Amino acid sequence: MEAALEQHLEDTMKNPSIVGVLCTDSQGLNLGCCGSLSDKHAGVISILPQYAAKLTTDPTDVPVVCLESDNGTVMIQKHDHLTVAVHKVTS
C-alpha cells in the first residue's frame, strides 16, 4: 500500500498547478506528503474536515475545506479514515 500511495502522490504532483499534497490518517499521522505540505501540517489538516462536518446536519455530507489566499488554495477532504490535502497555486 505504501508504494501505491507514494505513486499516487507523485502522479498528483505532475500537475503543474499543484505544489503540495498530503495524506493523513484519522489520528493525524502523516502517511505521505510531497512538495509544500509536510509532516508539520498533518495534525491540522486531519482535524479541519472533522470540525467542518459538525457544521452540517446531514451525516452523509462530506465537506471540502478550502483555505484560499492570494497565492493559492489548499483543499482538504476526508475519505473514510484518510484525509487528503492538495495545495494548488493560482495561475
UniProtKB/Swiss-Prot annotation:
The subcellular localization recorded is: Cytoplasm; Lysosome
Keywords on record: Cytoplasm, Lysosome
Keyword Cytoplasm present in the record's keywords: the answer is yes
Q: Which residues cross the membrane?
A: none
Which GO terms fall under biological process for this protein?
A: cellular response to amino acid stimulus; negative regulation of apoptotic process; positive regulation of TOR signaling; positive regulation of TORC1 signaling; protein localization to lysosome; regulation of cell size
Name the job this protein performs. As part of the Ragulator complex it is involved in amino acid sensing and activation of mTORC1, a signaling complex promoting cell growth in response to growth factors, energy levels, and amino acids. Activated by amino acids through a mechanism involving the lysosomal V-ATPase, the Ragulator plays a dual role for the small GTPases Rag (RagA/RRAGA, RagB/RRAGB, RagC/RRAGC and/or RagD/RRAGD): it (1) acts as a guanine nucleotide exchange factor (GEF), activating the small GTPases Rag and (2) mediates recruitment of Rag GTPases to the lysosome membrane.
Q: Which family does it belong to?
A: Belongs to the LAMTOR5 family.
Protein name in the entry: Ragulator complex protein LAMTOR5
Gene encoding this polypeptide? lamtor5
